[in-house]
Amino acid sequence: EISRPGYYEVMLADYGVKAQLTTTQRVGIHKYTYPTNSENQRIILDMIHGIYNYDGKVLWTNIRVENDTLVTGYRITNGWARTNYTYFAMSFSKPITHYGCEEKAKVNYRGGYAKFNMKENFPDIGGRKIVAYFDFDPKMSDELEVKVALSGVSTEGALKNLRAEASGADFDQLAAKAS
């Protein structure tokens, strides 16, 4: 484990994955190095858990797959603010090959959406207790970079933050600036 201002690194021993993190003011940058012979590279987006978890904290979550390298969305929580919206935009350094989700809460009614398989490759994911996953082709590279921008205003604000603070730069360049 390595930790210094603007940089954190840890080996995820259970998976053999090296995780490196750095940041700008509004963007978190992740770099994952998978074992050379990995058959799968997966990122989990857990929209349920956070600091100070309790049942009823998450009011709603939405995840939208915009294209094969961009995911946007938001989470509405109840707590220190009645309806606090946190918007995000995530970009990936290589294309998503497959994605899906699991709804951890009971869904009583899905209306017209019932005719769709909303658990796999459905581009608009919504629910109270959502955990999504994104798979990537390990043959392209052992490394995957993920940039996650936040905004308290809108998804468009998160996209603007992503473009303004992390566009055109890779993990190493952004880590050097953060130090």
Where do the protein language model's features map onto the residues?
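Beta-sandwich/jelly-roll carbohydrate-recognition scaffolds of carbohydrate-active enzymes
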Residues: 1-179
